[in-house]
């Protein structure tokens, strides 16, 4: 769940350190968060994230299930419209993801198949 924690930390007060001990490549997600304006960096098995008041919209690419979900969550709090590409990853792990977010009041639209 590191990508979701990183998305939350990106707009939380203070500095957070999120550790990934199993799949270090999962932290590649941090680069996509930086596209959204996050103040974040990786240091080995750790992501260090300093919270900022607002993320910015940008096109981002999902590399796996969790990264996709984290990018969608970050996009929901970003200023403007964020396009998350390669969402087929999300489909593999989260049933009715968009529909569930819509039911919670999210402004989200799935474009294409």
Curated annotation (Swiss-Prot):
Of the GO CC terms on this record, one is:
cytoplasm
What EC number(s) has UniProt assigned to this enzyme?
Answer: 2.5.1.7
**GO BP annotations listed:** cell division; cell wall organization; peptidoglycan biosynthetic process; regulation of cell shape
Pathway the protein contributes to = Cell wall biogenesis; peptidoglycan biosynthesis
Catalytic activity from the UniProt record: phosphoenolpyruvate + UDP-N-acetyl-alpha-D-glucosamine = UDP-N-acetyl-3-O-(1-carboxyvinyl)-alpha-D-glucosamine + phosphate
What subcellular locations does the record give?
A: Cytoplasm
Q: What is the predominant subcellular site recorded for this chain?
A: cytoplasm
Which UniProt key words apply to this protein?
Cell cycle, Cell division, Cell shape, Cell wall biogenesis/degradation, Cytoplasm, Peptidoglycan synthesis, Transferase
Residues that coordinate or bind UDP-N-acetyl-alpha-D-glucosamine: 22
Transmembrane portions of the chain = none
Keyword DNA damage assigned to the entry: answer is no
GO-annotated molecular function: UDP-N-acetylglucosamine 1-carboxyvinyltransferase activity
Instruction: Give start-end of the signal peptide.
Output: none
- One Pfam family assigned to this protein is EPSP_synthase
What job does the chain carry out? Cell wall formation. Adds enolpyruvyl to UDP-N-acetylglucosamine.
Give the family, as the similarity comment puts it.
Answer: Belongs to the EPSP synthase family. MurA subfamily.
**Which protein is depicted?**
UDP-N-acetylglucosamine 1-carboxyvinyltransferase
């Amino acid at each position: 769940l590191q990508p979701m924690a990183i998305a939350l930390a990106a707009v939380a007060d203070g500095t957070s350190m999120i550790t990934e001990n199993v799949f270090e490549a999962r932290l590649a997600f941090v680069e996509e968060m930086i596209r959204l304006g996050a103040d974040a960096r990786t240091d080995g098995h750790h992501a260090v994230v300093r919270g900022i008041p607002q993320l910015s919209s940008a096109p981002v690419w999902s590399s796996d299930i969790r990264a996709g979900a984290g990018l969608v969550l970050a996009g929901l709090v970003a200023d403007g419209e964020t396009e998350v590409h390669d969402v087929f990853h999300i489909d593999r792990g989260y049933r009715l993801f968009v529909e569930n977010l819509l039911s919670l009041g999210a402004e989200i639209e799935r474009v294409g198949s």
